[in-house]
Every structure is written in structure tokens, then in C-alpha cells.
């Protein structure tokens, strides 16, 4: 008789399946709070794994970038072509406090404004706001057909396009560097920067469909909790804490009058 293990007997029973655990039982929902310069503060909810061992749920949420439609944030369907990025900066209870992290156009909007027989003008520039944010702004515009024009095309000369780009850069830099981040974001929605570019370029070549199509955060200053809470419409107590004595620093105790 052969000595050894019987391979058939050592195998487990067939048909026994491993117990499947629903991954959503280990997760919990957190509310997304948009900054106060948006009308709808409750932007939505996000999922994260519960705090377990050394893994903290708050650490997993901080730095998370969320993309939302401006139509949902401002309750205005006409702004549905703008996508807003928000980044989670801090977690308070079950609420994620976010800050503005970027803006972009939807693909269908960009494709809808491109037309034949006209010149496309694009420019980008890095700007710094008064509160220390560095953004890269991208502008787009198109040459406009005149009312008394006979020619079919509205192509601008390369020298004219160069002048228009210089005007775009100048206006974007001027509008951004004189504003903080909140004021700059509020200029994107009514397209006040685009109208300024149209006025400035009128003497070079008339434009239409001029937009700041994209805004990208390049550099952010160190997060100040008081400013973050202020942007969310929450006030901090002035007496947030008391001075802590450094280790190794001796402080003589006060003399008591009576014991």
C-alpha cells in the first residue's frame, strides 16, 4: 500500500462558497458643504470607509476633489455648461468643508460655439489673487461677422490675433490681481471678464462668444481655519485657545497669599 496523503480526501467540499461581505457596510456618508458664494450650500454627499485602526476617515476625505455642475450649485439651469471643482479642506463632524479648486466648460458647450468661417482666439495667463492663490486662466473668443459685411468669411490677420491675445492677457491679469478668490469666482458667472475683452478688442476686430473657459488652481496658500470657516459663513471664537509653554521652558509659579 502506498504511503502518503490521499489528494482526493484532502480537498475541501465542493459547492461551499465564501461568505460575501457587502463593502458598503464598511462605509459611511458625509455631507459636502460648498463655500458661501454659491447659492446651494448642500452640494451633495460622498462615501468613505469608516475609521478603523490607524486608518482615519477624515484623512481619507481631506484633499478629495469633487466635480459638480454650477447649475446645481446656483440653482440655475442656464449655467449647466460650467463644471466646478471643489476640494475638501477640513471635516467638521459629518460635513466636508470645501474650497474652490477649478472651473471648466463641458465638451458639448465648447463644440457648440465653434463655427466655420471665423477665427478662434485663445490665451492663457498665470495670475495671483490678493489672498495668495495662483490660478491659470484660459480665455476663448471668436471673430464676429459685421452687419454690412459682404464677404463670407470673418478671418482675422495674424497680427490682429496677436493684439487680441495681448488684450486678453492684460484684462485677465488686471481683473484677477485686484480681487481675492471669492470675488474672482463671482466674476466667472456673469462673464464680466468676457465682456471687458469684447470691448477692448472692438477696435482691433469685433469678437463674440468670449469666455473664461477654464480656471485652474496652480498654487494655494497655507490653509487658515478662520478664513475657511469665514468662507462657509461660520464664525470662530476669538479666544480659540491659550498659550502653551514649550518643553524645557521654566515658568516660575505665582506666590500664593494664603494656603
Curated annotation (Swiss-Prot):
Task: Give yes or no: UniProt keyword Ribosomal protein.
Answer: yes
For this UniProt record, give its keywords in alphabetical order, as a comma-separated list: Acetylation, Cytoplasm, Ribonucleoprotein, Ribosomal protein
Residues the record lists as N-acetylalanine modifications: 2
**Pfam families to which the protein is assigned, alphabetical:** Ribosomal_S3Ae
Keyword Ribosomal protein assigned: yes
Q: Which family does it belong to?
A: Belongs to the eukaryotic ribosomal protein eS1 family.
Could you give the subunit structure recorded for this chain?
Component of the small ribosomal subunit. Mature ribosomes consist of a small (40S) and a large (60S) subunit. The 40S subunit contains about 33 different proteins and 1 molecule of RNA (18S). The 60S subunit contains about 49 different proteins and 3 molecules of RNA (25S, 5.8S and 5S).
HAMAP family, per database record: Ribosomal_eS1_euk
* PANTHER family hit by this protein: 40S RIBOSOMAL PROTEIN S3A
The molecule here is called Small ribosomal subunit protein eS1
Q: To which species is this protein native?
A: Cryptococcus neoformans var. neoformans serotype D (strain JEC21 / ATCC MYA-565)
Q: Which gene encodes it?
A: RPS1
